[in-house]
Amino acid sequence: MQIAEKTVLITGANRGVGEALVKEALNRGAKRVLAGTRGALSNTDPRVTALTLDVTNASQIQRAVDQVADLDVLINNAGIAIHDDLTDLHAIQKHLDVNLLGLLKVTQAFLPLLTRSKGAIVNILSVTSVAPFPVIPGYSISKAAALSLTQSLRALLTRQGVSVHGVILGSVDTDMTRGFDIPKVSPESAAAGIFDGVEEGEEDIFPDPTSRTLVDGWRGGVTKAFERRINAVVLEGAQIDLRERL
């Protein structure tokens, strides 16, 4: 899907990757960018409309829906990462509330508009979706669950004409990764890679050097092969033996 002349909604849009995604959508000719945020928005482009949107707040989600007449692309970018050691269930729940359930609630709320436009859902996931980072296990758990949700949505929404893209994002130089001494890309580079993948129709998008090290193993591996076979059941009603070797 080309971004030019499209209406794009981005959650978590006031800083980091979200802010960069807003700018990149504008650079690619988006007709309108809806910037979902809990804080102030610095972008003054007339094509940008700020939406007060905490993805854990049902009333804010509904108010946002009421303000949007049409939508082509939903980018579920809002997320949190809290240091934990699996001893604090509250920390794990906070990750799930934002990174998993918030994503699902926003998707459900805007799905009628996306179905009408035959649009796209872009879920910002993480390399920790496939390989946990033990320093932030709650984050890794939530992102792994969000990957599974993305795969399920992809199969279930195909018949409605809605494409679902999962972004396997590596480390980006933002507030979220400030305490980690690891290679990072700029938010702008990540945003460009994400939109490249969307415009090229990639189901799973690997937008940075770290995530691209996983490409061959992921796309040619048994996990992706199994996903395709399961999707065949949903799309075609095919009867397959799941015990059969891949």
Residue ranges and their predicted role:
Residues 45-58:
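Rossmann-fold cofactor-recognition segment
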Residues 50, 95-96:
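A hydrophobic alpha-helix adjacent to the NAD(P)-binding/active-site core of NAD(P)-dependent oxidoreductases
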